[in-house]
Design a protein with these regions (language model features):
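Cleft-lining beta-strand/loop regions that shape enzyme active-site pockets
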Residues: 20-31, 44-57, 61, 194-201, ...
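Extracytoplasmic/secreted envelope proteins and their assembly/folding machinery
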Residues: 35-43, 57-69, 84, 91, ...
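Bacterial N-terminal signal peptides that target proteins for export
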Residues: 1-7
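Conserved functional hotspot residues or short segments at active or partner-binding sites
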Residues: 176-187, 523-524, 528-707, 711, ...
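Extended, small/polar residue-biased N-terminal targeting/export presequences
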Residues: 56-142, 186, 193-248, 309-311, ...
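Bacterial N-terminal signal peptides
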Residues: 8-16
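PDZ/PDZ-like domain segments forming the peptide/carboxylate-binding groove
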Residues: 70-71, 92, 111-122, 132-166, ...
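Polar, glycine-rich mid-to-C-terminal structural blocks
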Residues: 467, 479, 484-549
Length: 718
């Protein structure tokens, strides 16, 4: 798992904050004894109990080292060929080293990686002191994953010269002046350089162990103590904190969003853009300065026990660096991560003179409060319980049909996938599992009657994986609803969490956890969702790249296979209506300007993906930019007569968002970044609207052909 700047939904962002550069070489990191013990224990488990047991030998050692190097330097910007030769000389030693609890090999690789970061970025900053000649005809290979490693330091420096030149040209084309470009890039490289001084031993171990785990199979992972805690939080949808999305921006931990109903929002004392410069515990605890501190460390200080006090030293959003601070006290409380929970909306779809109400339920994850369920908490949170409540509300609002939006739902609890399917098909088998011994077990739901028997559709994309695929596949096999969108991810494997500390009887978290593949999913029709995923009944275009995203993009994915079909009876026959549904969809989108724009965007993106080299000549790049602007202007004129202004505004916003400003996310203003995200969401709505129209067609056809609808044998609506 590579360390990246990324948001952890609703409460924190785990990214690396930049600060004023430290002098001297980066710290030399060394493994701790407990890490070596955890690696040894993990190896024992993975070789004995994994669904695909792979011995830790010389062959696997070579794969692990290669994957580890790739995770550190995927685009080959930092190491040179001599470094790689040095690393691969250790290929046959890693397995023995792990069993002897010796992690010097991965740590020595990482320490050289830190050294190379400092060398390359120091050189990049030096290049900013000079200008560049953009009249020259030269190209830059900006996608380098398949390129050879630089053969020498001179070749590496020339690569970085082109990289900096391209960064400069992008800002220049966006209208930035030379000094502003120097300032922006100087800060960018300084921030990147500062990260080399902030890595910890735990970071190195996490990256290495993930390289080891994923070398066996793509969905096997190692989670250190911090990562394991975050995984537990994401599944429970709750934690104790202040209720704020935090993000690193220009050395500060910045409030990006306030969670409705959380302590931060209810206090009325915090606003989006406020910067946290200090954290103190309790009413009298000493204030700790957190400027320049890694954001995950800041989050650890803000989290705490329920009903305890945390004090924050705040630099207001509208204050300058020397502005007046304010000190606020907040009482920590249990925060529900509502933005990951199921939500409903109602879309009104017109079809000729008829108007239909489509209830849309968006489910980002199959979450479940495992502890709450085990303890018998009557109000524990889970995806199926929340969706059941939303279905009851939609029925009261008299919707004609229900659309389950599972786009980018990466899965979660298997139990929840089964229970959620039961809400729509009633009692019966949902999914089959085969373990490492070859035993096949059928998982089903015993709900006496479905919660919704009306028209149903499921919207999926390439990001719909695991539990999402179980649900979509079962709905498809039962003939219960129409599956719409892109082909799904193709993750048909079952993982379990192995707590290494519990196995070792440790009193405190020390060794972390393994997420280990132990079984494989199969549809009730006998085929697996592994590798091939779920093929939609009605396909919609999407931005995903199957060559780089999805199960088929992994070089060591488990193959597709098949078992005997389960004993089940379809409850409907939506397939019988698919030709008519497809025909209506095709006719409609031919006249839908917004949908046509979306298809053009997808085609353009696919063409750009094939482009791995870009010109560093200013005239050539301006010509490309002018062609793009001309295309967008022509599109705007063509759509000027559209009656649906809302959809047109969404498309225009998406177009605007694609204009290259040469900036990285944390270099834009917070308001600009949030506006860009809103525009991206608007682009997604084009597909959602069409999916709702497809479901509207389905409703009409089911009403005219009731024999294809869900039969009452499964019970009446609850």
């Amino acid at each position: 798992m590579r360390l990246k700047n990324s948001l952890l939904c609703v409460i924190l962002a785990i990214s690396t904050a930049a600060h004023a550069l430290e002098s001297g070489p980066p710290p030399v990191l060394s493994p701790m004894q407990q890490q070596a013990q955890a690696a040894h224990l993990s190896a024992q488990f993975l070789t004995r109990f994994h669904y695909k047991p792979v011995p830790l030998d010389d062959t696997l050692s070579a794969k692990v080292i290669n994957r580890y190097i790739k995770s550190l330097d995927p685009e080959k910007f930092f190491f040179v060929q001599a470094d790689i030769d040095q690393f691969t000389a250790e290929n046959t030693k890693l397995d023995d080293a792990i069993y002897h609890e010796d992690l010097r090999i991965p740590f020595s690789i990482f320490n050289l990686y830190q050294q190379r970061i400092v060398e390359r970025l120091t050189y990049a900053r030096e290049l900013l002191k000079q200008g560049f000649d953009f009249s020259q005809k030269e190209d830059y290979s900006f996608v380098r994953d398949k390129e050879p490693w630089p053969k020498s330091e001179a070749e590496s420096r020339d690569l970085w010269r082109k990289r900096v030149k391209n960064d400069w040209l992008r800002l220049k084309l966006a209208g930035k002046k030379d000094q502003a470009i120097r300032d922006t890039l100087g800060k960018r490289y300084e921030n990147s350089l500062a990260r080399a001084y902030k890595y910890k031993s735990d970071d190195v171990f996490q990256i290495f162990m993930n390289a080891y785990a994923t070398s066996i199979e793509p969905h096997t992972d190692y989670l250190g103590t911090s990562a394991a805690a975050d995984f537990d939080i994401s599944m429970k949808l709750s934690l104790v904190g202040i209720g704020a999305v935090l993000q690193e921006r220009d050395d500060y931990t910045t409030i990006r969003e306030l969670v409705a109903g959380g302590p931060a929002q209810l206090s009325g004392k915090l606003a989006v853009g406020d910067r946290i410069v200090g954290v103190a515990q309790g009413d009298k605890g000493a204030m700790t300065d957190v400027v320049g501190t890694r954001i995950d460390d800041v989050v650890k200080q803000i989290r705490g026990a329920k009903d305890t006090v945390v004090r924050l030293d705040i630099l207001p959003a509208d204050a300058g660096p020397d502005g007046k601070h304010k000190l606020i006290s907040l009482v920590r409380n249990k925060i529900s991560l509502e933005q990951q929970a199921a939500k409903k909306t109602i879309l009104t779809i017109k079809n000729g003179d008829a108007t239909r109400k489509v209830g849309v339920i968006t489910l980002p994850a199959f979450y479940e409060d495992f502890d709450g369920r085990r303890k018998g908490d009557k109000n524990f949170r889970s995806a199926s319980r929340d969706v059941a409540a939303l279905l009851a509300e939609l029925k009261k609002e008299k919707v004609d049909s229900v659309l389950m939006d599972l786009r980018n739902n990466g899965g979660g609890s298997l139990t929840e996938a089964v229970d959620l399917t039961g809400l729509f098909v009633g009692k019966g088998p949902i999914v089959q599992q085969r373990n490492a011994r070859g035993d096949v077990n059928v998982e089903g739901d015993d709900i006496p009657a479905p919660a919704w028997t009306g028209p149903l559709a499921v919207l999926i994309n390439r990001g719909s994986a695991s539990a999402s695929e179980i649900f979509a596949a079962a709905i498809q096999d039962y003939g219960r609803g129409v599956i719409i969108g892109e082909g799904s991810f193709g993750k048909g494997t079952v993982q379990t969490m192995v707590n290494l500390d519990e196995l070792s009887h440790n009193d405190k978290p020390k060794f972390g956890e393994l997420k280990m593949t132990i079984a494989q999913f199969f549809r009730i029709n006998g085929g697996t969702t592994q590798l091939r995923g779920v093929t939609p009944d009605i396909s919609l275009p999407g931005f995903s790249d199957p060559e780089s995203f999805g199960e088929s993009s992994y070089d060591n994915a488990l193959p597709w296979s098949q078992v005997k079909a389960a004993d089940y009876t379809p409850v409907g026959d939506v397939k019988g209506l698919l030709p008519q549904i497809q025909s209506r969809h095709d006719t409609r989108v031919e006249k839908d300007k917004d949908f046509q724009r979306f298809q053009e965007d997808v085609a353009e993106l696919n063409a750009l993906r094939k482009k791995r080299v870009i010109s560093l000549n200013e005239t050539d790049r301006r010509n490309e930019m002018n062609q793009q602007e001309a295309r967008l202007k022509a599109r705007g004129k063509a759509g000027a007569g559209d009656s649906d202004s809302k959809d047109k505004d969404a498309a225009d916003a998406a177009d605007l968002n694609r204009q290259d400003d040469g900036l990285q996310a944390n270099e834009r203003s917070l308001s600009a970044e949030l506006a860009a995200e809103k525009a991206q969401k608007s682009a997604k709505d084009v597909l959602l609207n069409e999916a709702a129209k497809i479901l509207g067609d389905t409703s009409d056809l089911l009403k005219a052909n009731p024999k294809f609808a869900m039969q009452p044998a499964s019970g009446k609506d609850k």
